[in-house]
């Protein structure tokens, strides 16, 4: 009897799942049908990337730049801002934190990227003109960091500590503060309103940028048994001195999220513009205050573009503002910046990434005029290995996290593969779980079971093998500008394989379609994801932090069902579960990230790929990420409005059957259709991407390219 009841229950669950699937199919089929009628039986033979514009340099050379860079330069060119008269402090005085906080407040109130860049540019210009020594802390406060990301020094203070600090600093009851926080969903706003009603007998001196930054740094560095009370005391000291909107942004900085829709790319553009418009000079004559008065419009525009592109380039090789800013403030010659700021061991760079393709034919079409190599695409964790003279080893993740303590076995085994004469290097490779008895690669899921923090050699249960595929630096010389064929040759000349510990990525240099197909099958049989295809000589330099069409990936899923590449998406909301999913979220609203507009665009509703246990765990994990209303930088349709909204905090890898145009979703809107976005058909959850931040999610531009590529693939 008990068995029959269990069988009946299982059958009911099965019927519920079938009903949910049918309902989902009907919904997406309707959306897909709508996309067919879109003025969209358009020929996608021509690739459509971000619009570019041709400009003429000072030397008379023609150069292509992104239209967004040109637009920002044009707006900066028309600014009437006076960095001294419009500042709120005098030369020689420290920068008031209020000046920065008020800029944040203005940015939060608008959404236009160019206007945001203009506001930031003006803020930086005043700091450069009046207090250049405060530019570094002001910059760190703006990007909400206190040190280079690879140093792992972060804020993100616990909610309970912040609540108590706000209550103690404002003299309010803790329960009242909690109630306000629950109602408003923004502890920064609660802190500000609490301070505005507080009366003090002896007002604290005004906060400065340096004071706030130094205090945040002390809080982040505070460790030990008494650290909680010490942190709380430091926070209270800041809050007691706050005026106007300062408390809002100090609390948000402590939470680790400014939440004003500001991306680091915009900060870099603003900084570049400020350095051109108000060059650092140590004095304030009119020419220094406003470079536009001594240059023609055309020349100024060229310098703004040059500074923007050069700053982005040097930061991609030296992502450390402590090193960069002194150079930028001292070196007036923009073209000289790269000579001072370049690839250096112990400073990791964001890796070069590949564009997805839908099959071998697309690869051949894109690389028809180039020689190229096919490599096994290993299913592991991307790693950048830095080896310093003297033998010190650093292991960094693709997100620039220092994973050296996670992989002590790599540091121990690597010297066995280093040939004589190799004294320093930076390797790009994949860490893969490996069975040394069978000498076979293990699935990524096995690797993910390894402990993430301080690991002892004797406690390791999942051995790993390092598969090296690129060499970025060797014996004091950067190889970034060398073609891939030369870098690969140096890699093989400088290292030797140690089976099961250190191996070279399997590769094949060919342009024969049958050879590529056979090699792809061989990769899949070896438990790999598919192939990486890379140009060998033409356009074959290594480009840090860029997803390039000179690297393409072909994954095994294409052989199974012709589906699209996976996407990395951010859950921004959820829908209450029904039936067997009562008590947990039944589905989630996912978004891609538009790095130009600095917004999250909804792309699909997902409820497939989760186990019951996972749904329960997710519901618990999102409990403290619920917000009362969507962010100003969430772009969505009222037709797909979730029951609850979340902070953008995590990234999920998702697969889908296809992509289609939809009036209910906003992903890539304006890139394929002016009125419709792109949605995923039959999305399913694959895994959580712990190595990615929300800003590293799939972009709207990438979604549009995947949609067009799918049309191209169907046509071939």
What function would you assign to each model-found segment?
Residues 1-512, 589-591, 595-609, 634-639, ...:
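N-terminal nucleic-acid-engaging modules of covalent nucleotidyltransferase systems
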Residues 352-374, 378, 513-519, 535-578:
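Flexible, glycine/threonine-enriched loop-and-boundary segments that flank and lead into catalytic domains
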Residues 380, 463, 528, 549, ...:
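Active-site lining segments that contact anionic ligands and/or coordinate catalytic metals
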Residues 386-388, 543-547, 565, 580-586, ...:
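Short glycine/proline-enriched turns and hinge-like loops at secondary-structure junctions
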Residues 395, 579-585, 598-605, 612-617, ...:
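Extended hydrophobic-aromatic, low-complexity segments
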Residues 491, 550, 559-560, 658-696, ...:
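C-terminal catalytic or substrate-handling cores of phosphate/nucleotide-
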Residues 495-543:
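Metal-assisted phosphate- and nucleotidyl-transfer catalytic regions
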Residues 622-681:
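C-terminal structured "cap/appendage" subdomains that terminate the fold
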């Amino acid at each position: 009897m008990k068995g029959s009841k269990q069988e009946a229950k299982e059958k009911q669950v099965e019927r519920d799942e079938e009903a949910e699937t049918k309902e989902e199919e009907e919904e997406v089929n309707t959306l897909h049908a709508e996309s067919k009628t879109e003025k969209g039986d358009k020929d996608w033979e021509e690739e459509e990337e971000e619009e570019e514009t041709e400009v003429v340099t000072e030397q008379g050379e023609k150069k292509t730049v992104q239209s967004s860079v040109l637009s920002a330069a044009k707006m900066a060119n028309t600014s009437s801002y006076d960095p001294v008269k419009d500042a709120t402090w005098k030369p020689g005085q420290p920068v008031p934190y209020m000046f920065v906080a008020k800029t944040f407040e203005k940015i939060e109130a608008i959404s236009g990227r160019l206007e945001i860049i203009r506001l930031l540019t003006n803020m930086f210009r005043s700091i450069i003109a009046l207090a250049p020594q405060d530019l570094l802390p002001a910059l760190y406060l703006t990007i909400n960091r206190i040190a280079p990301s690879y140093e792992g020094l972060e804020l993100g203070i616990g909610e309970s500590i912040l609540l108590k600090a706000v209550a103690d600093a404002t003299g309010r009851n803790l329960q009242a503060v909690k109630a306000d926080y629950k109602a408003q969903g923004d502890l920064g706003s609660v802190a500000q309103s609490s301070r505005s009603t507080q009366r003090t007998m002896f007002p604290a001196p005004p906060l400065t940028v340096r004071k706030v930054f130094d205090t945040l740094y002390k809080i982040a560095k505070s460790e030990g048994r008494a650290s909680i009370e010490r942190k709380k005391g430091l926070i209270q000291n800041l809050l007691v001195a706050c005026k106007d909107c300062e408390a809002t942004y100090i609390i948000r900085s402590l939470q680790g999220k400014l939440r004003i829709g500001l991306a680091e790319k915009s900060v870099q553009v603003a900084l570049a513009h400020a350095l051109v418009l108000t060059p650092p000079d140590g004095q304030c004559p009119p020419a220094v205050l406003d470079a536009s008065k001594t240059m023609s419009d055309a020349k100024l525009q060229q310098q703004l573009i040059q500074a923007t592109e050069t700053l982005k380039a040097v930061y991609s090789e030296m992502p450390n503002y402590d090193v960069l800013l002194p150079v930028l403030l001292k070196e007036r010659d923009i073209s000289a910046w790269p000579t001072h700021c370049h690839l250096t061991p112990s400073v990791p760079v964001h890796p070069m990434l590949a564009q997805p393709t839908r099959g071998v034919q697309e690869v051949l079409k894109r690389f028809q005029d180039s020689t190229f190599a096919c490599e096994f695409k290993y299913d592991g964790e991307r790693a950048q290995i830095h080896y310093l003279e003297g033998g010190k080893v650093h292991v960094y993740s693709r997100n620039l996290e220092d994973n050296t303590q996670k992989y002590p076995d790599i540091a121990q085994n690597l010297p066995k593969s280093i040939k004589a004469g190799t004294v320093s290097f930076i390797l790009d490779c994949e860490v893969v779980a490996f069975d040394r008895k069978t000498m076979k690669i293990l699935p990524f899921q096995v690797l993910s079971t390894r402990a993430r923090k301080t690991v002892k050699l004797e406690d390791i249960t999942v051995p790993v093998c390092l598969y090296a595929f690129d060499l970025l630096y060797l014996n004091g010389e950067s190889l970034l500008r060398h073609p891939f064929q030369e870098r690969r040759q140096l890699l093989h000349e400088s290292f030797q394989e140690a089976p099961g510990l250190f191996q070279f990525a399997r590769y094949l240099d060919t342009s024969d379609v049958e050879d590529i197909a056979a090699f792809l099958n061989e990769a899949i049989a070896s438990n790999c994801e598919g192939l990486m295809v890379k140009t060998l000589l033409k356009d074959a330099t290594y480009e840090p932090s860029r997803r390039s069409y000179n690297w393409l990936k072909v994954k095994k899923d294409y052989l199974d069902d012709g589906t699209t590449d996976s996407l990395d998406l951010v859950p921004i909301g959820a829908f209450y579960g029904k039936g067997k999913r009562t008590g947990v979220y039944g589905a989630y609203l996912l978004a891609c990230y538009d790095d130009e507009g600095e917004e999250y665009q909804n792309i699909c509703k997902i409820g497939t790929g989760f186990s019951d246990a996972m749904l329960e765990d997710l519901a618990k994990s999102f409990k403290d990420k619920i917000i009362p209303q969507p962010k100003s930088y969430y772009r969505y349709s009222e037709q797909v409005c979730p029951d609850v909204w979340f902070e953008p905090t995590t990234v999920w890898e998702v697969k889908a059957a296809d992509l289609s145009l939809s009036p209910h979703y906003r992903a890539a809107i304006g890139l394929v259709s002016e009125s419709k976005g792109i949605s995923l058909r039959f999305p399913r959850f694959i895994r959580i991407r712990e190595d990615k931040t929300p800003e590293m999610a799939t972009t709207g531009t990438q979604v549009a390219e995947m949609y067009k590529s799918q049309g191209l693939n169907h046509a071939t």
